Amino acid sequence: KLYQDYPALYEYDDTPDGFEWINHIEAEKNMLTFLRKAEKKADTLVVVCNFSDLAYEAYAMGVPYAGEYREIFNSDDESFGGTGVKNSGVQKAKKEEKDERPYSIEIQVAPLSVQIFSVKECGEKMVKESKVRRELEKKIKEEHKKEENRR
């Protein structure tokens, strides 16, 4: 059901356009955070993977859009035999840069878990900023490829 209800989990499965790192270098916390993207920016999902047995009560992470983020999946839910650490309600994005993103949210992160958040009220300005960011990332990758070919 989760997979069917959220286009970001399937729309761009066969292309890199459906994935974007938020932070892949939190080695000291054993955590990875990334985006799953779809054709509509409002369908973007934020995925938090905690490979540590530690919970974090106030984990700040960068997000691409203004708006409200709601936890839609938590592998640590008590119904799955987890500890029940969860984010109830919504987490409103603050205009505080984090992880090279213009906004951030503060969440509770469950131990040994995967948590997925959907975004609501994604502003048009943020959609444009995200598009510009993707274009810049694409140019950087092309430059790196050219540099490698010269060697």
Segment roles from a protein language model:
Residues K1-R151:
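Carbohydrate-interacting/catalytic domains
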